[in-house]
Design a protein with these regions (language model features):
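C-terminal structural segments of small proteins and small subunits
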Residues: 54-80
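Amphipathic, hydrophobic secondary-structure cores in small proteins
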Residues: 5, 9-63
Length: 83
């Protein structure tokens, strides 16, 4: 499966992130549900990732935790998004 690359600013620095299109789609869906811009959501997740964890990995883990097995959005992530 091909990766999709996007460029955005995180913590004031320009970054390129590569994820599968399905992860980008879910991140966009989560951002809409939270009524936030996608860059804001990604910045929040990036700021709360574990030491040594890559940004792409943190984004994928966030999506997996946020979405239930049936594809419905959960309330998970409020701590990260509201911090």
């Amino acid at each position: 499966m091909p990766y999709e690359q996007r460029s955005l600013r995180l913590d004031g620095q320009r970054r390129c992130l590569r994820l599968e299109p399905e992860f980008w789609s879910m991140l966009e869906r989560i951002a809409r549900q939270e009524q936030q811009a996608l860059p804001w959501l990604i910045d929040r997740i990036d700021r709360h990732r574990q030491t040594g964890q890559g940004t792409g990995s943190a984004l994928c883990c966030f999506v997996i935790r946020y979405v239930d097995p049936n594809g419905n959005l959960r309330d998970y992530g409020k701590r990260v998004l509201s911090a």
